[in-house]
Amino acid sequence: MNATPATHDLAVKLALALVSVGLYWLVVVLTERYDWSGAVLGFQWPFHLRGLIFGALVMAPYAAGSAQRVVRMIALAIASALIYQLAVRFALDGPLDYSTIVIYVTAGAGAALLTGLAVALIAPRRFSWRLPVFTLVAGAIGGAAFDWQLPFAWAPNNLHAYLAWQLLVCLALDRGLRG
């Protein structure tokens, strides 16, 4: 069975999302082991690194063929770090009750929508009605996974949720940005 270019492209994107989740796991483990939780120059760098990794591996490839691609790729990684921070801050400090699934669904959907808009505007990519619909649905489902706690001894808390959210958002970006 021969893969079409679109199928191959999606497989590469999903593989990059898996690498992003693996690097998330590594950052969490190293942060806990070496107590890298302190701020450097006002930044909680392990915290921001998680968003940067997703942006660099999942969002930045959309800017690969554009003019000023390096600047756009860096901008997408930075946007991802900011989106990650906004989602976490909303979940922890927002107006909704932290103990319900609603906060996770809302934060996940909002972060996914912002991710799609960032790619469409910064990469840039042609905007379609499918992008906000797909990212909102993917983000909501991925966000709901954060309400489901799995006590794996070998994995940091919520690894399954990051895996679900990142893969679903990766798929939503791929399908939502197609013409």
Explain the meaning of each model-derived region.
Residues 2-179:
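Juxtamembrane/disordered regions of integral membrane proteins
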